[in-house]
Amino acid sequence: MCFKGISEALGREPTSLDLSKRHPLDLEWSRVPSGKSNFPYHAHSAQWELYLVVSGKGTVRHKDGRTEVVAGDAFVFGPNEPHQIINSGPEDLIYYIIADNPIGESSYYPDSGKWKVNKSSAADRIVIKGQETDYFDGEE
């Protein structure tokens, strides 16, 4: 998997609590190899995400089931809406994510009962399942 934090390349300071330095929106480019997923099935506590599929074929797992997506498709998930993007095609699945970048974001993982809490940025996180655990524990 490959992720490029475009907003950070444009000067976003992810650890800043100053919203003018954080940018109001976060833009990420993602490439997911065939048969892999972007992240475990999860729901954000405060964040909205808009997905724009650039190329490839995928399956979006959500609370109502699964939906196939292809290049040109767009979809959105709001807070407390669990989701996961799985590459169900033979080629890389490439898409953009535009998120609203809230301060104090956390995520819940329904399959494992874990929580991810961002201390100052997504890179500075702790994952809790009764006690701190590995990020992919119980997800694979």
Label each residue range with its predicted role:
Residues 56, 72, 85:
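Short hydrophobic/aromatic patches on the structural cores and recognition surfaces of FHA
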Residues 64-80:
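Short acidic-glycine-tyrosine-enriched beta hairpin
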Residues 1-24, 34, 110-140:
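A short, N-terminal "cap"/entry segment at the start of jelly-roll beta-barrel domains
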Residues 79-105:
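Ligand-binding loop in jelly-roll beta-barrel domains
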Residues 29-33, 43-62, 98-102:
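Short, conserved beta-strand element in jelly-roll/cupin
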Residues 10-15, 28-44, 79:
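Conserved short histidine dyad/triad with adjacent acidic residue
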Residues 50, 57-59, 66, 82, ...:
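Structural motif
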